[in-house]
Amino acid sequence: MSKKLIRYISFCGIGVYLLALFVVSVVFRDHALEWEWMLWGIGEVLFFFVLTTVLYPRWKNDEHKLFWRKVFWTALAIRLLYVVFSYYYFSFRMGQPFDSPGDAIGYYNRSVVLSRYIRKGDFGFVVNFLKGYSLGFSDHGYLIWLTFIHTIFGRSVWVARIFKALMSAYLCIVVYKLSSRTFGERTGRLAAVMCVFMPILILLTGMHVKEMEMIFLSILALERMDYLIRSKKYTLWNILFPILLIGMSFGFRTVIGMCLIFAFFVFVILSPNNLVSRKGKIVSLSVTLAVFLVFLFTVIGSEMKIVYMLNFSGTDYLARKYESLGLKYSEISKSKYLFPGAFVLPLSPMVDVAPLHNKLIHGSTFVKNFMAFFAMLSIVIAVRQRKWRNFSLIWAFELSYLTIVVFTFTSNSERYHEPAIPLILVMGAYAMTHMRHKDLKLFYVYCGLLFVALFVWNWLKLAARGIV
C-alpha cells in the first residue's frame, strides 16, 4: 500500500466526519453536541488517521523485533498517559473516576466488597454471592478478575486500569501475529499500527467495564487457535491454552465463547488438506465437539440456551421496546432491517440526545463506521483472489458474532459491537493492502452513503422523540 493511497484514504475519512458533524450541527443546531464532545470526537478521528498515515510508512520496513518494540511501547505509552488523564478528567467532570454511573461503579463496588471478605478469610460469603449473582456466569469473569486485583492491591482503580493498558498494548502484537500469519506481512503491520491508534482501544483503558479484557481474550484465543493449526505443533500446552481462553471468555460474554468454538470448527473444515489432513480434521473436530459438550453440560450450557432463545426468538425486541416508550419509527429497528448494516452499525451519534458514554466515543464510532467498508471489501477481495479459506477463522468469528448481536436486544449498543472492532481493522488492513484502483469507485460511493446515513441516523434519533 503506497504512502499516497493511505494518505488519501485518511483525508477522505477526516473529510466525511468533519462534513457530517458540521451539517448535523448546523441543521439541528438546537440539539447539536456540546463543544466538549465535538472536541473529543475531532481529536479521536484526527488521532487515528493522522498518526496511522505518518507512522505506518516509517515503520513498515523495520526489522521484526524493532517493529514489535515500536508497536508495543508506543501503544503502552499512549494508554498509560490516557489512564492518568482520564482518571483526573472524570474525577473533575463527574466527581468520581468513572465515565458513567452505570456498570462501572457496580463492578467496582461489588469487587471491593468481595475482596474485603476474602482478606477476612470468609470464602463462604464469596461463593454464596457468586451463586446468587443475578447477572449469571457470563458476568463472573470480570467480577472475579477485579476482586483478585483489589484483594492484592487494595481498592484503588489504578492497578486495574494499568492492567487494561498492558492488555491493550499487547493486543496490538497479537493482532499483528494473527493478521500477518493469515494475510501476509504488509497486512499484519498495517493492522498493528491501526490497532495502536484505534481510539476505542485506548478509551477502554480508562473505563471500569469488561470490554477491554473481553476483547483481549477473544483475539488472543483466535490467534492461538490459528497458531495451533498453521504451526502443526500439537503440544499439550498449544491445545489446552486456546481451550482455557475459550472457557474464560464464557465468563465475560457467553456469545464470545460460542462464536470462538464455531469459528474454530469452520476453520478446521475449510482448511486445505496441505494445512490439515483428513485425519487431522477428524481428530480436531472430535476434540472441538468434546469441548463443546463439556461446556454444554455445565452452567455455561444453560446460558448458551438462553442466548439462543434471546437471539432467535426475540428479533423484534428493540422495535417493541421503542414502541412502548412512545418512540416513532420503531419498525426500523427490527433485526431484518439492521442485518445488512451489521459491520457498520451503530452509526456515530452527533446530537445531544445520546448517552454521555456514546458522546465520548462518537469519534471512535465513526472510525469503525468508516473502516467497515474495507472490512466488507476484504471478503470480496478474498473471494476474488481465491484465498477465502485462509480467511475462514476470522470471518467465521466476525460474521457469527455480528449476526448474533444484530438479532438480539443489543444491536443498537456500541458496547456490544466493540469486540468486533479489532477484526474490522484486520480485515480492513487486508483490503487496503490488496485493493485495486477500480475498488476506489466503490469507496467513493461508500463515503457518500456514509455521509447520508450519518445525517439520517441522527435525524431519526431526534424525530423518534418528536423533537424535529
Language-model regions, residue ranges each:
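Short acidic/glycine- and proline-prone juxtamembrane loop motifs at membrane-interface regions
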Residues: 206-214
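Transmembrane-helix motifs of polytopic, lipid-linked glycan transferases
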Residues: 56-57, 162-182, 374-378
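Transmembrane alpha-helix segments characteristic
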Residues: 14-19, 76-79, 241-244, 386-406
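Transmembrane-helix signature of polytopic, membrane-embedded enzymes
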Residues: 158, 175-197
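Membrane-interface alpha helices of multi-pass inner-membrane proteins
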Residues: 202-203, 237-260
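Membrane-interfacial entry segments at the cytosolic side of transmembrane helices
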Residues: 63-70, 233-240, 272-289, 436-448
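Hydrophobic, aromatic-rich transmembrane alpha-helices
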Residues: 53-54, 343-388
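Membrane-interface helix-loop-helix junctions at transmembrane boundaries of multi-pass membrane enzymes
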Residues: 176, 181, 231-237, 277-279, ...
